[in-house]
C-alpha cells in the first residue's frame, strides 16, 4: 500500500503485512494491559502482627483483671497493631509472547492508517533547539497533540519539544503500544517508517 507524504509531493510504499491488518481489539487490550502492569512499581508493604516492633510481653495476666484477654499489644485489633492481611511487594508483570506483541503493534499501526491519524513526512529537523521553531513547524502540519517518531533523533528537535504538553519525541526503537494509542496523531519520518516496517515484517 502507498501512504501520502505530508508537506511534500509523492507517496511512500509500505508493506500490507505491517500497515493493513484487521484491528484486533482483544489482543491490543491484552498487550497494553501487560505493558502498563509491567510499569507498576509493586513495592507497597505493610507489617503483620509478627513484624511490628514490640508486643513481645503479654500486657496483663490472662484472668482476674476484668479486662478482655490480650496476648500482645500489636494485635490487629489494637491501635498501632499489625495489619491482618498485610500487603507485600509483588511483581505485577504479565507475560506476552513476542509474536503477540508484534501482532498487536501491526494492528495498531494499521488502525492509525485507517483512522487518518498517521502523518508521514520526508524528514523533521530544526535549525536550533528553539520551542518557537518547533511550534511553528507543528502549526504548518496542523498538529497539536502528537507522538513524533524520527529515524535519527535530532537533539534540536528533542530539546525544542520537551517542554510542550501533549507532544512526545521518540526514535523508532523506543515506541510502545501505549504511546501509539495515547496521542491524536502519530507523526513519523520516512526513515522511521521503514525501520518500523522492518521490525514488524
Swiss-Prot record:
Cellular component terms (Gene Ontology): ribonucleoprotein complex; ribosome
Keywords associated with the record: Ribonucleoprotein, Ribosomal protein, RNA-binding, rRNA-binding
Listed GO biological process terms: translation
Region of interest (Disordered), residue spans: 39-67
One Pfam family in the UniProt entry: Ribosomal_L4
InterPro entries: Ribosomal_uL4 (IPR002136), Ribosomal_uL4-like (IPR013005), Ribosomal_uL4_dom_sf (IPR023574)
Keyword rRNA-binding: yes
A GO term for molecular function: rRNA binding
The keyword Ribonucleoprotein belongs to this UniProt entry's keyword annotation: yes
Family: Belongs to the universal ribosomal protein uL4 family.
Function, in words: One of the primary rRNA binding proteins, this protein initially binds near the 5'-end of the 23S rRNA. It is important during the early stages of 50S assembly. It makes multiple contacts with different domains of the 23S rRNA in the assembled 50S subunit and ribosome.
Subunit structure: Part of the 50S ribosomal subunit.
The protein's name in its UniProt record: Large ribosomal subunit protein uL4
Organism whose genome encodes this protein: Marinomonas sp. (strain MWYL1)
Amino acid at each position: 500500500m502507498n501512504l501520502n507524504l505530508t508537506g511534500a509531493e509523492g507517496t511512500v510504499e509500505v508493506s500490507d503485512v505491517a500497515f493493513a491488518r484487521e484491528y484486533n481489539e482483544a489482543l491490543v487490550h491484552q498487550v497494553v494491559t501487560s505493558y502498563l502492569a509491567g510499569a507498576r512499581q509493586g513495592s507497597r508493604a505493610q507489617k503483620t502482627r509478627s513484624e511490628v516492633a514490640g508486643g513481645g510481653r503479654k500486657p496483663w495476666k490472662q484472668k482476674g483483671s476484668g479486662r478482655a484477654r490480650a496476648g500482645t499489644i500489636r494485635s490487629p485489633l489494637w491501635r498501632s497493631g499489625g495489619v491482618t492481611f498485610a500487603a507485600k511487594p509483588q511483581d505485577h508483570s504479565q507475560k506476552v509472547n513476542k509474536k503477540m506483541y508484534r501482532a498487536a503493534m501491526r494492528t495498531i499501526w494499521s488502525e492509525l492508517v485507517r483512522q487518518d491519524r498517521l502523518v508521514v513526512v520526508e524528514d523533521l529537523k530544526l535549525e536550533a533547539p528553539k520551542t518557537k521553531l518547533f511550534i511553528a513547524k507543528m502549526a504548518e502540519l496542523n498538529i497539536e497533540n502528537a507522538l513524533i517518531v524520527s529515524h535519527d533523533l535530532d537533539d534540536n528537535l528533542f530539546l525544542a519539544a520537551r517542554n510542550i504538553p501533549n507532544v512526545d519525541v521518540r526514535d523508532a526503537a523506543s515506541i510502545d503500544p501505549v504511546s501509539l494509542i495515547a496521542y491524536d496523531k502519530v507523526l513519523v519520518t520516512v526513515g522511521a517508517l521503514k525501520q518500523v516496517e522492518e521490525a514488524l515484517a
